[in-house]
Amino acid sequence: MIKDTQSTAENQANETTHFGFKTVAKEEKQQLVANVFHSVAAKYDLMNDLLSFGIHRIWKRFTIDCSGVRKGQKVLDLAGGTGDFSAKFSRIVGETGQVVLADINSSMLEVGRDKLRNLGVVGNINYVQANAEHLPFADNTFDCVVISFGLRNVTDKDKALKSMYRVLKPGGRLLVLEFSKPIFDPISQLYNFYSFNILPKVGGIVVNDAESYRYLAESIRMHPKQDELKTMMEHAGFESVNYYNLSAGIVALHRGYKF
């Protein structure tokens, strides 16, 4: 009887996951996250600038500097959304290289495609609607995979990391730019106040959707801490994994290699 009860509890745990602070069935989370990004896609870039005071551009510049991407290489911009990374990598890899902007959300992908075309970024970029857990690419395809502020929204992060590992070429690297845990308590307290009191209000005013930005704050708190994500990447097969705390750990950049 005890064994049966334990087995039932384990099965239920395996079938559920977090959507912010809520516990939901795994098959529900993907649609719930999709609804969030369908809602915010049109003003996603504006909200990034407002909520980070433009600092997200510095975080992204540092990520590009750490990527080691060169002319002629192939880059996967996963959960690439509105295409900030794709625009930069397109110029770096040049005509002989290729960038794939992949996102599971059709609204985000459409905004990204329109934005890059308006900027004249064409020719070496492909757009693919794809689930990070089941990437539709052959083994050993990319020199670099970048996922920026997307991993925390993935239902099965371990499966997604293994999928990223699979599509990387030997010698390739994965970069994960994501919100993390502040390393100083005073900053953590201020950040918590900002996240739960300011973010939803700004979202309500600008996007008319406070709930999506409340989810943003909650999803950050549920995301693995720096050392936990490092361990997850190592379990997925990545080697020489390290991370950099940016803005006192509000954001962290993890980097790992496939050898």
From Swiss-Prot:
It is an enzyme of class 2 (transferase). InterPro entries: SAM-dependent_MTases_sf (IPR029063), UbiE/COQ5_MeTrFase (IPR004033), UbiE/COQ5_MeTrFase_CS (IPR023576). Pathway: Quinol/quinone metabolism; menaquinone biosynthesis; menaquinol from 1,4-dihydroxy-2-naphthoate: step 2/2; Cofactor biosynthesis; ubiquinone biosynthesis. Its EC number is 2.1.1.163, 2.1.1.201. Pfam families: Ubie_methyltran (PF01209). One of its GO terms (biological process) is methylation. It comes from the Bacteria. One of its GO terms (molecular function) is 2-methoxy-6-polyprenyl-1,4-benzoquinol methyltransferase activity. Keywords: Menaquinone biosynthesis, Methyltransferase, S-adenosyl-L-methionine, Transferase, Ubiquinone biosynthesis. It catalyses: a 2-demethylmenaquinol + S-adenosyl-L-methionine = a menaquinol + S-adenosyl-L-homocysteine + H(+); a 2-methoxy-6-(all-trans-polyprenyl)benzene-1,4-diol + S-adenosyl-L-methionine = a 5-methoxy-2-methyl-3-(all-trans-polyprenyl)benzene-1,4-diol + S-adenosyl-L-homocysteine + H(+). S-adenosyl-L-methionine binds at residues 82, 103, 131-132, 148. Methyltransferase required for the conversion of demethylmenaquinol (DMKH2) to menaquinol (MKH2) and the conversion of 2-polyprenyl-6-methoxy-1,4-benzoquinol (DDMQH2) to 2-polyprenyl-3-methyl-6-methoxy-1,4-benzoquinol (DMQH2). Belongs to the class I-like SAM-binding methyltransferase superfamily. MenG/UbiE family. NCBIfam families: MenG_MenH_UbiE, PRK00216.1-1, PRK00216.1-3, PRK00216.1-5. This is Ubiquinone/menaquinone biosynthesis C-methyltransferase UbiE. The gene is ubiE.
